[in-house]
Curated annotation (Swiss-Prot):
The gene is tuf. Pfam families: GTP-eEF1A_C (PF22594), GTP_EFTU (PF00009), GTP_EFTU_D2 (PF03144). This is Elongation factor 1-alpha. Its EC number is 3.6.5.3. Residues 14-21 are annotated as: G1. Its main location: cytoplasm. GTP hydrolase that promotes the GTP-dependent binding of aminoacyl-tRNA to the A-site of ribosomes during protein biosynthesis. The keyword Coiled coil does not apply. GTP binds at residues 14-21, 91-95, 146-149. Mg(2+) binds at S21. The lineage of its organism: Archaea, Methanobacteriati, Methanobacteriota, Stenosarchaea group, Methanomicrobia.
């Protein structure tokens, strides 16, 4: 059963039309995670619309189309098992808020598959996603050179694309020699579950084998305790029960904890998971817990719980490294968008633009730039408009990443480099 296997969050990244959805659909179908009757139904529908090649992509259909056709695919179907792990596919880019989801919280990916279409090679979005995944701390990567059927399974073309992608990976500190580059056709299923006879020249692993040889993510249980609060309930006879997912550290019954930025604290009376009381909670556990002396007004979404002797850091201001993904004009000092970090959403002001970086190499390109635009990477000083918990990414990576949102879109992604505490 899945619970006995280590769990991995897998991001599937790459340019919008390079076949990510078909790739994920095929992976899940071949791994037995999608009932055959659903696929048959899609094949039939796709055929009628003259879009036969979309059968697998339809498995991963975006919400809008699902609603139009009155079908929904439960998120549970985005899980699949291999011999070694059970995987959850976290949102593919292109899905709404991918970047925000990737940065904040539950969908923190442990590894990524980069899908690059053989006919097109590297596109702008390919670069952006590689850089972003690096910024977000993903350090295990598998490259699928997809749509090989469209280039007649040409080894020469495969080598050209490997060359292109390796160049970018090197620039941002990945070692191409440690990364499998797998020629695939998600539509035909080549080199997904097993090696294909259409690519006799390819000697590496198929996708499944590459997934099985990923390294299990280390549980950050030795780090200080941090539990971002998702919500707080009042339960009669018990009192106030905050709920959230343990990001780092271990919490035991009887521990003295504190909720920041508010500062209310007390002793842990009980911890519950899946409606059962447990003696301690470890990273990844979704729990409800009750703290003696904590009232309804002492704790809210966005607070972070930690041990009283090592409380979460509350920033008066902090220095962040950001990548600007999109902005209609330019960003200057004084800009005050909403920052999403763990479960908090707080307006923060960019009080200084310190350095502009070369997004490919991380080298300083310009000191004290006057503005930033889409595609720029920078070091900036940020002042939250109200108290906010954030941690340097080197100390507690799970609480060091953030997304910047404005005008209904993700403007930038970033990580906290240092905190000046209140």
């Amino acid at each position: 059963m899945a619970a006995d296997k280590p769990h991995m969050n897998l991001a599937v990244i790459g340019h919008i039309d390079h076949g990510k959805s078909t790739f994920v659909g095929r992976l899940m179908y071949d791994a037995g995670a999608v009932p055959a009757h659903i696929i048959e139904k899609y094949k039939e529908e796709a055929k009628q619309k003259g879009k036969e090649s979309f059968a697998f992509a339809w498995v991963m259909d975006s919400l809008k189309e699902e609603r139009e056709r009155g079908i929904t695919i439960d998120i549970a179907h985005k899980r699949f098992d291999t011999d070694k792990f059970y995987f959850t596919v976290v949102d593919c880019p292109g899905h709404r808020d991918f970047v925000k989801n990737m940065i904040t919280g539950a969908s923190q990916a442990d590894a990524a598959v980069l899908v690059v279409a053989a006919p097109d090679g590297v596109m702008a979005q390919t670069k952006e996603h590689i850089f972003l995944s690096r910024t977000l701390g993903i350090n295990q990567l598998i490259v699928a050179i997809n749509k090989m059927d469209a280039v007649d399974y040409s080894e020469a073309r495969y080598k050209e694309v490997v060359e292109q992608v390796s160049g970018i990976l090197k620039m941002i500190g990945f070692k191409p020699s440690e990364i499998p580059f797998i020629p695939t056709s998600a539509f035909h299923g080549d080199n997904i579950m097993k090696l294909s006879d259409k690519t006799p020249w390819y000697k590496g692993p198929a996708i499944m084998e590459a997934l099985n040889s990923l390294k299990e993510p280390e549980k950050p249980s030795t780090l200080p305790l941090r539990i971002p609060v998702e919500d707080a309930y009042t339960i009669s006879g018990i009192g106030t029960v905050p709920v959230g997912r343990v990001e780092t550290g271990v919490m035991k019954k009887g521990d003295k904890v504190v909720f920041m930025p508010g500062g209310a604290g007390g002793e842990v009376k009980s911890i519950e998971m899946h409606h059962e009381e447990i003696p301690q909670a470890t990273p990844g556990d979704n729990i409800g817990w009750n703290v003696r002396g904590i009232g309804k007004n002492d704790v809210r979404r966005g607070d972070v719980c930690g041990h009283a002797d090592n409380p979460p850091k509350v920033a008066d201001e902090f220095v962040g490294q950001i990548v600007v993904l999109q902005h209609p004009s330019a960003i200057t000092a004084g800009y005050t968008p909403v920052f999403h970090a763990h479960t908090s959403q707080i307006a923060c002001q960019l009080i200084a633009l310190n350095k502009k970086l070369d997004p490919k190499t991380g080298q300083v390109k310009e000191e004290n730039p006057t503005f930033l635009k889409a595609g720029d990477a920078a070091i900036v000083t940020i002042k939250p408009t109200k108290p906010m918990v954030i941690e340097p990414v080197k100390e507690i990576p799970q609480l060091g990443r953030f997304a910047i949102r404005d005008m209904g879109m993700t403007i930038a992604a970033g990580m906290c480099m240092s905190v000046k505490q209140k």
